[in-house]
């Protein structure tokens, strides 16, 4: 490569230009919060809870102190969610994505390191010294656009991290209600088992006295055996639900012995009315907002690819050569890649395909969000109506039937076995209400997630729940 020699003034201009570029490139620094303030604000606004990235022993001690204070009393759903947001290790790993994205942003704002070449050769008594200082001009020209692309990427990661925090919060709420319902399921199974045991004992005694057939005895014994198996199944389901909640909260050791309320929260007085659920979802969902940022970033990347389609390598160098007996040789050299075989068409086509792929995925996300919120709202209203139906109709009717049967039993109009069977049916109706109540709270959580993590102000969500 032959250097092009210019007047002594031009190299000074080149050096000044290079130093200015380096100074500007060095201005790219890390933010004080590492992007975490956005995640904190979104989580506080939509879930009413705080988040904290554990980066030091002091942070870990502060988090543990907060967790211990909440574990000292029976947990409500809000406590469980707060513990998960602070202590879930998978979520803490997600928080680290902010640091990775910001590092990429800062790196995009910094120029490539310049190169310096020194060469000394001797030919007889003659000494030739060559000095070359080079810079990558392409990185200088494209740095603003690259930084803009990474800036959008950083904003996208903020939304994705906040969305993951809201997902963990929703999953913890579901697990919380499942865990309480699991405990109630064990209580119901034990009540049924006690009634079945009483019926089996009575049938055995009456059979021994000849007042009960072997067939009837076998039926009562079979029901008792099935009820005993039901207790085992209920206990297993309860342990699994509680362990899922434990994992989401990131608890271990003595902390796993946390206390839960014995009963689920009662049904709200009125359900939530939504007339614009789809528009709310499209406006508030973080996955849609992140998808828009991704698409905008890819559009910028496509522009960058087209900009560097023909010229991908462009180096500018300042030359200072000294040779014995000759005046110094100064100038600059320009190194450029010749697009002889690769005209950049493949890279542009690939960038265009990736951009179109992002557009279609964003459209898919929007379509799925509309469907998700419609389905969630239907499930929410159905769950509310079903729970209210159990509370206002089925349970009162079963109680009335039980009261009437007790009067008939006292009047010797029905047998004790009929009374026990009626008691089992009444317990089943109450348990059905508890199941419907659990389904309602989970359905409300699903609706909240489908709307972007927050229900309207006139919602039926219990504060603290």
Predicted regions mapped to residue ranges:
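A small-residue-enriched
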Residues: 27-49, 82-139, 242-251, 276-346, ...
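C-terminal structural cap/anchor segments
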Residues: 347-389
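Periplasmic alpha-helical coiled-coil/stalk elements that build and connect Gram-negative outer-membrane
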Residues: 2, 28, 143, 159-280, ...
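Short, charged, amphipathic alpha-helical segments
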Residues: 95, 148-151, 214-223, 416-424
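Short segments within alpha-helical structural elements
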Residues: 197, 226-253, 361, 369, ...
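Amphipathic alpha-helical coiled-coil scaffold segments and their short linker/junction regions
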Residues: 70, 80-87, 149, 212, ...
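Terminal intrinsically disordered/low-complexity segments used for targeting and assembly
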Residues: 2-86, 235-280, 448-465
